[in-house]
Amino acid sequence: DDPSDFFFINRLVMIVYGVAIAPHHMLKIHASVTELEGNALLFLGTSGTGKSTHSRLWRKFVPRATLLNDDEPILRIMEDGEVRVFGCPWGGSTPCYRNASAHVTALVHLRQSPENKLTKLRGRDSFDSLYSSTAFLHSDKKRHLATFDTVADVLEQIPVYRLDCRPDEEAV
């Protein structure tokens, strides 16, 4: 009956799920996902960077933009090689638990800045941006390597950008 029990169990299940899916070309990532007409942008960054805020700005200023997940979406490489993102039972500051998916068009790593500037990341920078947003277990070599491989495979298809930005319409 203690609400903290539910929170603990929910977080534990989320962590176990994130580790269990690794060998199946899937990643649980820390991101906010905005969808527009079947295509998705994933906003990455550390907690407090503005991922939820940026997704909210897209919904405010871009007609038909919707929120797919606000905190812990699932990224998956499908059998045909397509990279898709899925909603899941874990949301963030904005409750959003959609049983839906979208084609991933880009990953955008956010950084707060007084100026808005978009830069395409390459090589190690793009890898670090996505890898640091994934859930993995260092002590489980098989799953850790599977996560590593899936990140590399995603990056062969999906561009990664860094968006230095203010929380305003111009950043959208």
Regions found by a protein language model. Give the residues of each.
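Glycine-rich, often acidic-flanked micro-motifs
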Residues: 31-32, 36-46, 60-172
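Post-Walker A alpha-helix
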Residues: 54-55
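Charged, amphipathic alpha-helical linker segments immediately N-terminal to NTP-binding catalytic cores
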Residues: 1-18
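Generic structural signal for well-ordered alpha-helical scaffold segments
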Residues: 17-21, 152
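Pre-Walker A adenine-sensing motif
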Residues: 20-36
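Generic, well-ordered alpha-helical segments
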Residues: 4-9, 26, 139, 143
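Conserved glycine(s) of the Walker
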Residues: 49-50
